[in-house]
Design a protein with these regions (language model features):
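Phosphate-binding glycine-rich loops and adjacent basic patches that engage nucleotide phosphates
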Residues: 7-20, 57-63, 111-124
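Extended, charged/polar low-complexity intrinsically disordered regions
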Residues: 1-52
Length: 156
């Protein structure tokens, strides 16, 4: 028996090469990038939370993280800061384009693509996210480039 007999790769979700966060602004790329991101829900999160109980941060699966961001974007009086930390090549830029497409609301078709992908990971999280969505000003910055934050914000 071979691995290929047990597992199948979803070629519809394959995106070749590294994703750049600023591709959120590229109309030719953003749809393919946002649609190809594969969210995982709490049932498929490969982290044992007991191992991380003594840390100051909580690890989240990507569907739960999307919900957390949608909730925070709806709040008006709290600190809405969230940080994503992960190693090189783990999909942070890909995730950022998908989340920006979801939260900005500038393109409803794009938002629905992302919601569909979240639904595959966890239908209940997708339904809850829907109650928090509205249009947001989303500014995506590529931290790998040397940039002046003030000029980047003014350019948007």
């Amino acid at each position: 028996m071979h691995i290929r007999d047990i597992l199948k790769f979803n070629k519809d979700k394959y995106f070749g090469g590294a994703v750049q966060a600023n591709w959120f602004y590229d109309a030719d790329k953003v749809s393919a990038i946002a649609d190809s991101y594969v969210f995982h829900g709490p049932k498929y999160h490969g982290v044992n939370q007991q191992e991380w109980q003594n840390t100051s941060y909580k690890l989240n699966d990507t569907a739960t993280y999307a919900l957390k961001l949608a909730k925070r974007a709806s709040e008006t009086e709290s600190n809405r800061f969230c940080m994503t930390i992960a190693g090189y090549g783990t999909g942070k830029s890909h995730l950022s384009v998908a989340l920006a497409s979801l939260l900005s609301g500038h393109d409803e078709e794009l938002r629905q693509l992302v919601l569909k992908n979240i639904s595959v990971a966890d239908r209940h999280i997708r339904e809850e996210i829907g109650t928090y969505l509205h249009k947001n000003l989303v500014i995506v910055l590529n931290g790998m480039r040397d940039f002046n934050l003030n000029s980047q914000v003014l350019a948007t």
